[in-house]
Amino acid sequence: MDERRPDLAIQFIPLTYLGIPIPYRGRTGTEREKVAKTYEEINNRIKTGEAVVMTAEEVVDLVREKGAERAAEEVDVVTTGTFGAMCSSGAFLNLGHADPPIRMTNIRLNGVEAYGGLAAVDTYIGATSLIDPPGTGYGGAHVIEDLIAGKKVHLVATGPGTDCYVRKSIETNISLDDINEAYLYNPRNCYQNYGIATNTSDRTLYTYMGKLLPRMKNATYSSAGTLSPLLNDPHLDTIGMGTRIFLAGGEGYVSWQGTQFKTTVEEVNGVPVGGSRTLAVIGDMKQMDPKFVRGLDITGYGISLAIGIGIPIPILNADIMRNCAISDEDIYAEMVDYSLPSGRKCMQRYNYAQLRTGKIEYEGKTIRTSSMSSLAGARKVANTLKDWIEHGEFLLNEPCLSLPKEGKLKGLKDGGQ
């Protein structure tokens, strides 16, 4: 992790949308005043090793014991984490020019198609792209994992041949050390909550939520609950463009709102009960750790990429601390029937404490539950990020642009004008 650059944390233009600065009374004041800190103060404490950092799980009991305002005085940063399937992910690669050069228009990496519609040797490989011929359980996500793990990947590329790019084909092996830039750019990661999937039909369903047994014999969900990044900052008061994050074992940044970003989902206890806000993120693959990146073959569905993402929440005031103290008992998700091709409606709501027991009750029926995301992985992410901050290796960035406060989804019209 020697390549991490804490100095990058101060290069973004600061905003005041996070609140009008209020003088911070410090840790030794005797009067109880409203807690107000700044990014600069927190970063200075990180640099000197004085910052108090806790994970989102750890602060739940602290706030219950001392209240949000007292806890906000004591804690500087809360770390979050999630580790689960994030299909809307991929990597930009610059493969370098051969001699003689080629303008690549058809590109395959380990047999997986990559996009050839960029400049001569730039490409984007999507996580869900399939190997040709399909059926081996390998795809773009596995290519990304292999590259991050330091493995060689077989490149085959062709082009039309032009006066300036005379070559028409090339075949070689590449690794991250051999190519120029390589970075993840994921258009939609870090979903703010998600639904619970079950199956009321008489046949087994194979979905991106896993294998759903007939007649509601099981239900699956996908969230880190208490640790989930966007559930700890539900209205994105501290998360925006330029926020520095833990991405796949390296450092990354929030680059924009994620696709399918919406704010119209009903909230319970201050957080949405279904998929709501999302993030687009970017990071240097050459800094990443293969322990936090996994190519997935989801039976009967296809390929996806599991990624570990952690976001530090600066405790600027008591309201932010109060948001970070949300527990699994407070976070609800809606169960829906995936056997319905459309018009899926909520059957019942359950909180994550109930889901994590391994079973729920629905109209007198006991349903087994399991998670599509890794709670152990989420904890590893949050604790690793905590360790980085405590050792002064990771500073916080104030966003240079806030993400939308309102967002609605549009559906695709079938045959529409």
Q: Language model features by range: what are they?
A:
Residues F12-G117, Q417:
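Long alpha-helical, hydrophobic tracts
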